[in-house]
Each structure stands twice: as C-alpha cells, then as structure tokens.
C-alpha cells in the first residue's frame, strides 16, 4: 500500500510522465511502479487452500491444507498458521491503500491483482463466520496450532499432519479480531461493491461491540492485542464510509474523544495518538478516517502531532522496532501519505520524508541491499519462509546457510 501512496505522491508532484522514468532503471531508489507489483507477490506465496495451484501467481505454489475446517485464506508470515488478527489488519490496510490511491493501481494494471487478494481474505473471513439472520453465532479466529506449527519445517504442500490444523471458534470472545474482519470487509465493499461483504461487516462489528472481550490464549501467545477499542473504531470508520449511517460515525467520534480505559489501559484518542499502525494498534488509522470524515482541524492536529514526532529525519531510517522493522516504517509511510493527500485540511506534506525512507528500504543504505525480495539483483535473499525455502524438513535444513537448490524466490 505504501508503494501506491508514494507512486501517487510522486506523480501528483511531478506529473504522470514520471512513470516512464521510474521504470527505466531497475536499481533506482524510486521505482515505485515495480515496487507496487512486487510487494503484492508475497501474498501469492502465502496463499492457503484447495485452489492455490490455480489462484497463486507463483507456479511453484500448489494447493495445501485442503482439509482445514475453514478453507482458503493466507498463511501468516513464513509459517502455516492462519491467525485472525494480522490477517484482518493486513486485509483492511491493503484495502485502505487502494481506497486512498486507486488511480495508481489502475494506471499500472494492478487493480485485478489487488482485488483478487482482498477478495480472498474476505472470502475467508465470511467462511469463518456463522450467521443466524444478521447475527453472528460464532466465528473462527485462528486455524492452526501456533507453537506446534512453528516447530515444523516443511512446505505447506507436504504438511499433512491434521493435528496441527485445529480451527478455533468462539461465540463470546475475540472482539478485536471480529472488528478487524469487519473493517476489511467494509473497505472491500467500498472498493469493489460486493453486498455480502457489507452484510458480514455489519454483523461482525455488532458482535464485537456486544462482546467486548479479547482473551483468546491460542492467539495471544503470538499476536497479543492490547485492546479491542481501536479495532472497533477502525471498523466503525469504514462502515460509516460504506453506509453513511451516523451510528458508526458516532462510535468513531466517541473513540476520538474518549479517555475511558479499555482492556489493558488503552484509552480513546482524546489526548492524541500514541502508536504507529500495526496489527496490535490501529488508532492512527482510525484517527485519519475520523479526520477525513469531519475535516476538523482539531482532529487532523491529533494525527499530525503524532506524525511530526516520528517523520523527522530523511537521512536516518525510522525504526520503531528491530523485529520486522520495515512493517512499522512502511505503515507509518502509509499514514503519512494519506495525511499528505488531504494536505488542504491537514496542513502537512510528508512526501519527501516518505520517499527518503522508501529509498533506504530499496537499497539507499550502507549495505546497498534492497530489502524487497526478488525485486533487484541486490535484493535480500533467503527470508524465513518455509514454502519458498525448498527444504522439506528441519533435519534437511539443519546447518544450512542458504536456500535449497530447489528453493524459490519469494
């Protein structure tokens, strides 16, 4: 999504003729057109289900885990569990990128690929949800046993141990995950118009605000959400944009002006935003939606005050955490460039900072390494990814320092 924001930001500043120059050099630090295309291939590598052999754009990926209680969806990271919280966050953020910067996807012929990915996420969320009328009776928030799966090394196509594929359902918990599913479904409805997406989004949102709990140990051992309030506000923002129903904008407004503590002490955003976008906190995204909806200077000030404290140096890589640092960096870029899009109201333009940060990710760094796998000759190789590694067992991989000769470029 941040690739699309940068592409749009660059063309807005320099004119559409820059598209040709950006594609001219594979080693350039601003080849956002190629970056947008290549960044989405990760999801083709992570597809799960009985149709992967035809759905994935990678010929080396085959169908897998076809006996899962809930078929389809995507594996998490380089392993094979389907965790609900990061899946919902990912799908809603991909949808957000398209919502804000649709023209970039369209101009580059990438809309069909993006839509295939977000539809696949949403199809999985709907298949994970049991309805009675418009009411959620239960939903599946995880498929796969976290630690047991992490103790295995093999391709998904050869992982046949069904004892590792437990589906976890709840009828009165996981409010955070339900809200993330709802957000993803709502923005996908806005983007592509599937009425079933909106139906399920409303139902999952209502379930979330009714249950108000986030205490699922199977998920928390790997993705421990601090609260559910931010997820509900994020979903409410998208549902308002989808329906124009003031019930949703009222909830979002309450979150933006609330000080009441949530599950673990998280409050609303009355005093500002305090976290970069990530799977465990989407307050910044919710605050941007609120600001877009109201256009209010005080709402935008909460967003820009936070961003001004983070988007400071164009020569130092922004590192929120050294574990998966680029996810925080690019998520912050996404928020910053969405804010830049509305500069007439927000009063800020962060495009120069974002271009500098993305340049570092694309190789303008002391190591001269492009951290987007497969994009350039100097791209990072051998990520932690079981499907791509070429090794079929831990014993086969043990002691090796590179991918198998049967490995693939992710």
Regions found by a protein language model. Give the residues of each.
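Solenoid-like repeat scaffolds
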Residues: 257-262, 269-276
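Aromatic (Trp/Tyr) and acidic
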Residues: 27-97, 140-191, 229-254, 277-313, ...
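Short coil/linker segments at helix-helix boundaries
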Residues: 99-117, 161-169, 187-200
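Short, surface-exposed loop/turn segments at secondary-structure junctions
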Residues: 29-30, 77, 103-115, 194-195, ...
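Carboxylate/His-rich catalytic cores and anion/metal-binding grooves
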Residues: 117-132
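Internal metal/ion-chelating core segments
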Residues: 182-184, 196-240
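Active-site-adjacent structural elements in folded domains
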Residues: 166-169, 216-223, 268-274, 315-321
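Sec-dependent signal peptide cleavage junction
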Residues: 3-4, 9-27
């Amino acid at each position: 999504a941040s690739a699309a924001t940068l592409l749009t930001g660059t063309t807005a500043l320099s004119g559409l003729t820059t598209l040709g120059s950006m594609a001219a050099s594979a080693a350039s630090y601003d080849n956002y057109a190629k970056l947008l295309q290549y960044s989405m291939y990760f999801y083709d590598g992570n597809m799960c289900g009985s149709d992967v052999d035809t759905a994935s754009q990678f010929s080396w990926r085959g169908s897998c885990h076809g006996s899962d209680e809930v078929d389809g969806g995507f594996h998490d990271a380089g392993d094979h569990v389907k965790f609900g919280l990061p899946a919902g966050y990912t799908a809603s953020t991909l949808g957000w990128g398209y919502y804000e910067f649709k023209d970039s996807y369209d101009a580059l012929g990438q809309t069909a690929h993006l839509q295939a990915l977000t539809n696949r996420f949403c199809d999985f969320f709907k298949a994970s949800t049991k309805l009675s009328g418009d009411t959620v009776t239960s939903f599946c928030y995880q498929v796969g046993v976290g630690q047991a799966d992490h103790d295995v090394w093999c391709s998904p196509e050869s992982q046949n141990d069904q004892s590792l594929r437990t589906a976890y359902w709840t009828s009165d918990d996981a409010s955070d995950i339900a809200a993330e599913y709802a957000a993803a479904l709502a923005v996908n409805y806005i983007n592509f118009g599937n009425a079933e997406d909106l139906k399920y989004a409303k139902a999952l949102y209502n379930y979330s605000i009714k249950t108000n709990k986030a205490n699922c140990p199977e998920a928390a051992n790997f993705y421990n959400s601090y609260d559910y309030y931010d997820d509900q506000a994020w979903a409410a923002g998208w549902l308002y944009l989808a329906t124009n129903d003031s019930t949703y904008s009222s909830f979002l407004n309450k979150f933006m002006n609330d000080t009441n503590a949530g599950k673990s002490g998280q409050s609303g955003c009355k005093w500002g935003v305090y976290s970069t976008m990530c799977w465990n906190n989407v307050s910044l995204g919710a605050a941007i939606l609120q600001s877009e909806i109201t256009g209010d200077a005080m709402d935008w000030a909460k967003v820009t005050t936070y961003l001004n404290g983070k988007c400071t140096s164009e020569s130092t890589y922004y590192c929120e955490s050294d574990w998966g640092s680029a996810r925080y960096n690019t998520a912050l870029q996404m928020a910053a460039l969405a804010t830049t899009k509305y500069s007439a109201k927000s009063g800020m333009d962060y495009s120069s900072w974002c271009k500098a940060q993305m340049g570092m990710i694309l190789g303008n760094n002391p190591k001269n390494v492009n951290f987007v796998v497969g994009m350039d000759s100097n791209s990072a190789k051998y990520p932690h990814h079981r499907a791509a590694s070429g090794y079929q067992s831990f014993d086969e991989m043990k002691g090796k320092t590179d991918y198998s000769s049967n490995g693939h470029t992710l």
